[in-house]
Every structure is written in structure tokens, then in C-alpha cells.
A protein has these predicted regions:
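Short helix-boundary/capping micro-motifs
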Residues: 10-28
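A short LG(V/I)-centered, amphipathic sequence patch enriched
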Residues: 14, 40-62
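Central regulatory/effector-binding core of bacterial HTH transcription factors
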Residues: 88-152, 213, 219-220
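A late-sequence structural motif
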Residues: 105, 253-296
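Hydrophobic hinge/microswitch elements
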Residues: 128-133, 137-141, 147, 196-255
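Beta-alpha-beta core module
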Residues: 153-158, 162-163, 177, 224-273
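Flexible hinge/capping segments at coil-to-helix
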Residues: 154-190
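Secondary-structure junction motif
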Residues: 189-210, 277-287, 294-298
Length: 298
């Protein structure tokens, strides 16, 4: 049993088939199939049921997948510890960033990190908090930005804590106000976030607490697109203040939102509790402490 065989097997499951696994691993489909077959032979049991182009884990495969992910994670951590001996002259940062504010908050930090550590390769994944958390637990990511977690499986470092603003069409009856209460938007169609965004849950909880269910008309993880829909008169979107400030455009007004205290965008950078953090990840966290988010004057 070899690590390359374990990695091929894990990627077949994660990517949904041999062809996609081969693309991820930069080897041919036949090479992936051969490595999985060799793994099954060495273990003496089938790990996959092959149904046409589909694959499904056998009972043994489920056990092996769990152990293989743990072994690959330990292998990666071993390599990371060895990389530390080279003082970041090489290495890899597997980083997750929130979709909503990638350009607003992280483009400059990303560039500064690359300037300081040009030989560190960055593997970047953007997504909602659920996607980031799952990727960290599986070992796909080492550290990532997420709404502050309550799950003890994660350790975290606070990054920012932003209120939400409301972006409204300029012809909305409340558009001339300086602020708006969440319950005043009960009859306005809502543009929501992707389902992987935990912020959706907080918004729904806040609305239900105030006695209404928001009228959802669409979802997106792209703040620019959501603002464009507002400008087209499609509804209201609630966005972190630091993001909303940069999205005001013709046809859109920004109002301060009055809502329950828990409806905030409190981003932390999280990692698996007890996991070894590579020097590359430690350097990223140190950079975040060096350049904290500053609240602008409203």
C-alpha cells in the first residue's frame, strides 16, 4: 500500500469518478484505475462498486476512506513540518476565503503575502462557511475564513466583525431613510446568499424572531451580481458594511440596518483544533494580525 494509491482512491471519491480524479492528480484515468486496483489487491477486498461511469463505496471502502484521509493528512503535516526547516523558501498554503469580500478585504493581503513569500505556492478555495469548514475537516484546506464557529472541532483567530447594511433600489419607499429596521423589509423581496453561507441561517433566524419569513427571489455568492440585481429593482440584499460601501451605484442606495445583534458578519480564520499549522499558515495568520480591518466612517 502506497500513498499515491491512497491519494488516487480518495480523489476518485472526492471528485466523483476516475476521469476527474486523473485531472486533479495530473495523471491519466487508466493510471488512477490501476492505482486503485493495486490498493484493492494489497488490501484483499473491493473498495468500490463500479456501475458504468459511477462509483460507490463498499462497506470496506467507507472504512478505508476515513483512514486514508487521516493518513494523507498526517503525511501532509509531516511534509509541512519539514518545509518549516527551510524558512519558507518553499512550501504550500492551502487557504480558503469567503466569497462575499474576496476583492474588498483580501486582494491586498494576498498580494502582500506573495511579496513576502514568493516561493510559497497558494492553493486557494473560495466559498461559504459550510464549504470552508468541510474542506478544513477533510484536509483539503489548512486554514480558511468563515463565520466565527461554535463547533469545538475548530480553533480560530478573529479577523473582522461587521454589521450588515441594506442595499435597496432607489425607488423603494424607504430609500430616502438613513436607516431601516429589518422588520420594515418584510414585504420586500429578498436576494439571498448561496446555501453554503451560514449567514443565510442567521438572516432567517432574525426574520423569524421578528415575525416574518423573507420572500426569497434568488440566490448568489457574488456580491457584485447581487448589487446589480438591486439596481435592476429586483429586491433588497443585506451585505457586510465593508462590502456594501463599495457597491453603491446608480439605482442603489445603502441604508444602515437595525437588526438583532447576532445578525453580523463576524469572520474568523479557522483551522482544525489540535492540527499542526505549517509555517506558511502561521505567516498568513500573522499577516492578518498585522493588518487588521479598520472600520471606515459611515
Amino acid at each position: 500500500m502506497e500513498f499515491k494509491q491512497l491519494r488516487s482512491f480518495v480523489e476518485v471519491i472526492h471528485r466523483g469518478g476516475f476521469t476527474q480524479a486523473g485531472k486533479t492528480l495530473h495523471i491519466s484515468q487508466s493510471a488512477v484505475s490501476k492505482q486503485v486496483a493495486q490498493l484493492e489487491q494489497s488490501l484483499g477486498t473491493p473498495l468500490l462498486d463500479r456501475i458504468g461511469s459511477q462509483v460507490r463505496l463498499t462497506a470496506a471502502g467507507q472504512v478505508v476512506l476515513q483512514r486514508a484521509e487521516a493518513m494523507l493528512r498526517l503525511h501532509t503535516e509531516l511534509l509541512s513540518e519539514l518545509d518549516d526547516m527551510h524558512q519558507l523558501t518553499r512550501g504550500e498554503l492551502r487557504l480558503g476565503l469567503p466569497l462575499l469580500a474576496g476583492d474588498t478585504l483580501f486582494a491586498g493581503l494576498f498580494a502582500e503575502y506573495r511579496r513576502r513569500y514568493p516561493n510559497v505556492t497558494i492553493q486557494l478555495l473560495e466559498g461559504g462557511s459550510r464549504n470552508i469548514e468541510q474542506a478544513i475537516l477533510s484536509g483539503e484546506l489548512e486554514v480558511g475564513g468563515s463565520l466565527k464557529p461554535s463547533d469545538p472541532a475548530f480553533a480560530w483567530q478573529a479577523f473582522c466583525d461587521e454589521p450588515l447594511d441594506a442595499l435597496l433600489p432607489i425607488d423603494h419607499p424607504l430609500a430616502d431613510n438613513a436607516q431601516v429596521r429589518l422588520e420594515e423589509l418584510a414585504d420586500t423581496p429578498f436576494l439571498m446568499y448561496q446555501r453554503s453561507f451560514v449567514l443565510n441561517d442567521r438572516l432567517m433566524q432574525a426574520c423569524h424572531q421578528l415575525g416574518f419569513t423573507p420572500k426569497e427571489i434568488g440566490r448568489s455568492g457574488q456580491a457584485d451580481f447581487l448589487a446589480a440585481l438591486v439596481a435592476a429593482g429586483q429586491g433588497v440584499v443585506l451585505l457586510p458594511s465593508v462590502v456594501a460601501r463599495g457597491l453603491v451605484r446608480p439605482g442603489v442606495v445603502r441604508l444602515t440596518l437595525k437588526a438583532p445583534d447576532f445578525l453580523r458578519w463576524d469572520i474568523a480564520f479557522i483551522w482544525r483544533e489540535g492540527a499542526y499549522l505549517s509555517r506558511a499558515a502561521q505567516a498568513w495568520l500573522a499577516l492578518l494580525r498585522e493588518f487588521p480591518v479598520k472600520r471606515a466612517v459611515l
